[in-house]
Amino acid sequence: MYAVFMSGGKQYRVKKNQIIQLEKLNNSPGSIIEFDKILMISAKKEVKIGEPFLKGTKIKAHVENHGRLKKIKIIKFNRRKHYKKKQGHRQYFTNVKILDINNFNGK
């Protein structure tokens, strides 16, 4: 069984007990969270697709930890104008473990 849900403007395909990396969530490590914007659920040969979301369906997850990704460098440069701008960015993330995919509408 797998599900597709939306978090932080992105879509993620998950299975039970899978650990995924999401955009930063404002939940403390060790807390349990629920995602209710479920786009699709597939169980064996049965597929349910939401319009746009499935009602009565939730994904339960455990917040493992927070962190930051590797630094990326941004460089702007104009030749012959003596202009060079260098900038860096480190994106925050949250690791989440999927505990359960609940489908209250059906089996």
Swiss-Prot record:
Key word Ribonucleoprotein present: yes
InterPro entries recorded: bL21-like, bL21-like_sf, Ribosomal_bL21, Ribosomal_bL21_CS
Pfam entry (one): Ribosomal_L21p
BP terms from Gene Ontology: translation
NCBIfam families, A to Z: L21
Subunit structure: Part of the 50S ribosomal subunit. Contacts protein L20.
Function: This protein binds to 23S rRNA in the presence of protein L20.
Family named by the database record: Belongs to the bacterial ribosomal protein bL21 family.
Record-given protein name: Large ribosomal subunit protein bL21
Organism listed in the record: Buchnera aphidicola subsp. Schizaphis graminum (strain Sg)
Gene: rplU
